[in-house]
Amino acid sequence: MSTLIGTLGSGVSALRTFMKGLEVIGNNIANVNTSGYKSSSAAYSDTFSNILQRSAPSSATATNTAALALGTGVKLGGISTNFSQGSLQNTGRSSDLGVSGEGYFHVKNSGDGTEFVTRDGSFRWDDQGKLVNNQGYRVQGLTGGGLGTVGDITLGTPPVGAELQSVSFDKSGNVIEFYSDGSSATTNQVLLQNFTDQSALVKEGSNLFSGMLAAGPVGAASGSFAFQVGTGNAPGANGLGSIQSGTVELSNVDLTEQFSDLITTQRSFQAGSRLITVSDTILEDIVNLKR
């Protein structure tokens, strides 16, 4: 009887676990058109086993004894993120920035000072001349006279008697402003951040990641997460990718793979459900034997 109860428990663990797997797959499919989205995948592992007999080494009078163990079900072993690059799509807006290669944009919430990184370069200029993302978080980089200050990417002041006509970004992240008098100036540089362990980054929604310190920011001061002047966070340097203005990175979700995983996970869920049904039927038969 206890074995059948254990079988029921295994079936229940399968339903709970594979439901979570279906949630992961469903979230990937739902974000197939989300800029900068990184797909996730679920991994499964067995739960603690009931040891019926422990193994024993061979001796002069007996051969070795194999262990006997009964599994108790399945559990979610972990959820991992696929950080591979998605395709770059042209948008026609110069403030949209894609990264061809490694690196993340660094954005900051000016309200509470929280910082995040993202691969979603859907940026715009706000009414204060700040380069911001869709949530209004400010893009960080080099700014100020001689580009010697780390802070918000901010439009510069046009020359006396001139007006700002257009803004462009080169592959190194330099912000080049063009004025009505025919002059131009490099006023900012968008920087990128790379990590020694991307798997430590935490999804926060809105295509943002936190957990930068745990991920090991390359070039940051010890115990902090901030760009450092002259430490090689420029796009195209030290293994970082280049900036592609007028593009955004698409989701890296592979629909073919997701639908395949959906089918296999659904079958696993159905098998767990069937296990519960069969165990219940056997228990009912046993109860009826006592009548």
Regions found by a protein language model. Give the residues of each.
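Amphipathic alpha-helical polymerization modules
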Residues: 1-144, 158-291
